[in-house]
């Protein structure tokens, strides 16, 4: 209970900071190039591997779990899910060039630390003071704000053990906190440990709506009160949530996760969940499902599928706290790519997804990024595809 009293004090302090902060003007939706794209399949272009020992601006490059492209500046942003263990929580700017055949250039150009309301960097678990207003962050997704390209959105998965809820924050392009969305739907932790998000399986994906007015997020795994985790025999229901910019839930849909595609070795691990989402158009999202299966020798294999989802379909569940005893219809989904069925070589722990520049033939491109977990046995890969409309 002390943790939750501290959270309330922390929330009050952040709100006080934000109220006293200068206001920011946004472009009108008519000034924004609406994201209206179509997709029927993905054609592989190329993969570029970032070396494990890559460093930049005295930080270790790794754990890259989110990626976002700014078509106006032609810059790419990549966020690390480092919980300030290797270096303080941060994101990178980069130049990434590719054509319809191959990657030509990947160059890191800037690094920015993410900061808290008091202007300090996020602490790690070891240095965190539970009597302070500090937060231990677990960054996952990053998006450039289409209504103000000097701003970014990023998500954190929270930490049940420390009493931190998942959050959605708006920051400057240099990492300074601007706004903290006061999300109030049932993803938040209760004080009896019976409900809400699972540790390290919470706000994994985010995307702005096609007009930039709204924010969609995805839960990697079902809430505790919604469903069991997927197995090799059955899938599970998780949530896609649409917020306005004040953090109010506009609509929420159930998403049916696939069963785990392969049986793990005896007493080994396996999971499947949503790794990222991306707005395709007014009616559809792309959803990236990632399954990880450990074999008998403790080796992990990743299974990556990309679905096109009809967000107008399915039951609106925003007022349903638990899905277990509710008869709800999930959104309709259509497979457009199974990366394991394409000849793309090694598939690592893909967590991020972003549209890139248009290709010379006018088709859109899509880039995935994998999170190496700061593990020398894993790879940080950028993988590019052509989107066939």
What is the meaning of each model-derived region?
Residues 22-389:
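Sequence/structural signature of beta-propeller domains
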Residues 1-29:
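Sec-dependent N-terminal signal peptides of Gram-positive bacterial secreted proteins and lipoproteins
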